[in-house]
């Protein structure tokens, strides 16, 4: 028999001539067919197969003297599927003889569903009764006795929706531990991947669980199945196994988390159980350090996807006893509600590439990412960085303010357009200073342009997220482009430099709001303006432009049909006023779409007048259109805009502190990764500390960050501490006290600081 790891030998299937070889292809809309449905029969369509027709093979002549060998009863797919779905093993009698007589196997296309590739074993597992089906073991034994080179137990679905789905996956989904044991004992591969479209994360109906049987059991909260798959003596599952995306079972658990209390509790329980199981089965493997194809560990994946609850748990996970090395938080000292904790900064600090801080600030698509930066240790870590870089932030603010004052003075004292851009040798002092101002403006524009290009280049892989979230960066880039272009046109003595110059000046003063994020109250005000413009105002303008264009075209069309000056105003009129000498005929009020749009805009802001020229032929229709426009825009759209803006402002105000923290985090990381500052080596926060001993006896050293907390909710819980008092490391005789080793890039004497008075935000 061919081994499970080697590919099966090539063979032609056989046909006894009575099979329905229908190979129709459904060219309509492709939708995932049901794996099992009581309201729909199995699909008979299948891909074309080259088979050997046994009816064309000459049988040996019958020996009249010898007893004749009777041909066994015929088993087709419908009969076999009916038997296994009802769970009647007695009706499988004669199946083995029929397979041998016709050189068939249970994995042949004659015994699989055409649309999905479902086998009779899958059919049996799909129709369990009280978690069992009496036909499963006979099918496995018949398949083994028939000498099938391709084991039935490892047969997989072949269609694009359920590709790779196996009987083991189905047994796990049916939550039958007994069936799982039966399949594994009979050679089921525990590392088969279900990689069809239904099992991939995309829009529409799908269920991504990590493709592997172990991941499916973990994501469906079956700890007994998980334990069996990891500890069975036949083929133990590997915790390091990955799917087609490079995700392990821990990644899969992060992906199915949805931040609800019930789901989070189950995911966290399973996550911790797998970590502890991994520590027992493979103590040398760091499961949380395994990255997928995107370079994301489970912690980084939770940060990118915005899975706040599982992200909080991983950051603040604390174990005691033999599983303490799995912790990322270590209680160093506590007194009542006051607790001093050490947090593991691996993969968190921006000192490392693709850190958690950078992912939250620049690569996270979740609208609630501001809730992650206020979690410990990120909150205190960002505050530590801000305190260190705040002088640089205000230095940049002062330089930009001086630059804008120079820009304003130069723009205000612009000479007439007919004067040369470069003054002659007899130029006055004012003209020389004006030329110097233009040169400084050009240099500043080039500096801003290089800085913004560097910003977007570093985020080129996440360009869509960058454009959606980099409001001020886009404005700075536009300002820099206009500034450089205006100065080039200025030295080329082109008059169009002036409009570009004033546009750049306006953008420059608007961009001054960027530096308000250094203060909480002004920073939140800036965020409110940004959210209102990007969310509410853009939607309002889209609808408003549709109304404006439609009504403008209608008014222009009606204005062309003016009454003849000699025609009477009505039937009773006999005298028509003639224009006097020197008096020109009054033009139509809406001569073009632009004029009509400007007049209609006045109605939108409440400054329009309903008076119109008497020579209009359809005055009633024009009046009706104007009244409808006022109702739709001035009354309806403007009030909807005000209501939406109020809702946005209230939402931002409710989360003002966390949103401001996110703005500060972005500013801190931008200063660390700036065009000039990034040339220096980044500062690493925290210190290298010994927090315990690993299972192999080696010291467990982590780069940790100390955080002082006050927690009245859980202060009665007794946790093991690393120190007996807050005097810091170095106390002789304390075997649990961490011995610190100052690193090259370590923080200043952080470990020796006494406890300070704590202030809640």
UniProtKB/Swiss-Prot annotation:
Record membrane topology: Multi-pass membrane protein
GO cellular component terms, A-Z: axon; axonal growth cone; cell body; cell surface; endomembrane system; growth cone membrane; lamellipodium; melanosome
ANK repeats: from-to residues: 73-115, 116-162, 163-208, 209-244, 245-293, 294-320
Tissue specificity note: Ubiquitously expressed. Expressed in dorsal root ganglia, trigeminal ganglia, spinal cord (Lissauer's tract, dorsal horn and dorsal columns) (at protein level).
SUPFAM superfamilies cross-referenced by the UniProt entry: Ankyrin repeat
TM helices/strands, residue ranges: 393-413, 434-454, 461-481, 496-516, 538-558, 622-642
Positions annotated with a glycan in the UniProt record: 571-572
Keyword Cytoplasm included in the entry's annotation: yes
InterPro entries found in the cross-reference section: Ankyrin_rpt (IPR002110), Ankyrin_rpt-contain_sf (IPR036770), Ion_trans_dom (IPR005821), TRPV (IPR024862), TrpV1-4 (IPR008347)
Intramembrane segments: 573-609
Subcellular location per the Swiss-Prot or TrEMBL entry: Cell membrane; Cytoplasm; Melanosome
GO biological process: calcium ion import across plasma membrane; negative regulation of cell population proliferation; positive regulation of axon extension; positive regulation of calcium ion import; positive regulation of cold-induced thermogenesis; response to temperature stimulus
Record PTM: N-glycosylated.
Cytoplasmic-facing ranges: 1-392, 455-460, 517-537, 643-761
Entry-annotated residues carrying Phosphoserine: 6, 15, 82, 748, 760
Catalyzed reactions per annotation: Ca(2+)(in) = Ca(2+)(out); Mg(2+)(in) = Mg(2+)(out); Na(+)(in) = Na(+)(out); K(+)(in) = K(+)(out)
Keywords: ANK repeat, Calcium, Calcium channel, Calcium transport, Cell membrane, Cytoplasm, Glycoprotein, Ion channel, Ion transport, Membrane, Phosphoprotein, Repeat, Transmembrane, Transmembrane helix, Transport
Coiled-coil positions: none
Residue segments, region Disordered: 1-49, 56-75, 564-587, 720-761
Keyword Ion transport annotated: yes
Side Extracellular, residues: 414-433, 482-495
Stretches with biased composition (Polar residues): 570-581, 734-746
Molecular functions per Gene Ontology: calcium channel activity; identical protein binding; monoatomic cation channel activity
Self-association state and partner proteins as the record states: Homotetramer. Interacts with a cAMP-dependent protein kinase type II regulatory subunit (PRKAR2A or PRKAR2B) and ACBD3. Interacts with SLC50A1; the interaction probably occurs intracellularly and depends on TRPV2 N-glycosylation.
Protein name: Transient receptor potential cation channel subfamily V member 2
Species this protein is from: Rattus norvegicus
